[in-house]
Amino acid sequence: MPQTKILVDTNAYLRLAKSIRPLLFVPFGGDEYCLYILPELNEELTARKLQSKFPWVDEDEFAENRKHFPNIARKQKKTIHQTFEYVWDHVQTELPGPSRVDALYIAYALELGAPVVTDDQDMTKLAEVFEAQVMSTLELLKIMLDSGHTDMKTIRGIVEYWEYFADIPANFKADYQRIFGE
């Protein structure tokens, strides 16, 4: 059965990678879900601000797990680049806020027909403009729960971690209640 690719942006990666190990490139569930990042996420993680807040990202376990990317054919790369240019132009003229990497994730999502996991509200708006599939970190956790890839104890622990570091996604309370019924 072919994989169901799901792209994970920087904020979702940072919220999950420490608790669900390994996070990336591990198929799970009947639909063979598999999480991927883009190479540009590794570049973002070199920022001093992120390095000081998330020093664990340089540990071998996490760096090694971030070496797997979606396989992209040459023709797809060209289409992704063209789509990126169009999306990035829209960001610069109509919807300031998303980064170049955010726009690139949207371009990949459109070409691959894969959802992007993000809690970034600007990126979510951009995805909606281009009708790219997007899901929140909580929605991904629900898929993982339903697939037996995680359990509620782990999810509650992740949420406690977010609360401790004051890193709660937008609309968290309502979304958590809607998704998990707690």
PLM region spans:
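Active-site-proximal, substrate-binding regions of enzyme catalytic domains
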Residues: 2-112, 121, 156-161, 170-182
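Acidic, metal-binding active-site segment of PIN/NYN-like and related structure-specific nucleases
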Residues: 98, 105-140
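Acidic, PIN/NYN-like endoribonuclease modules and their adjacent C-terminal/linker elements
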Residues: 124-182
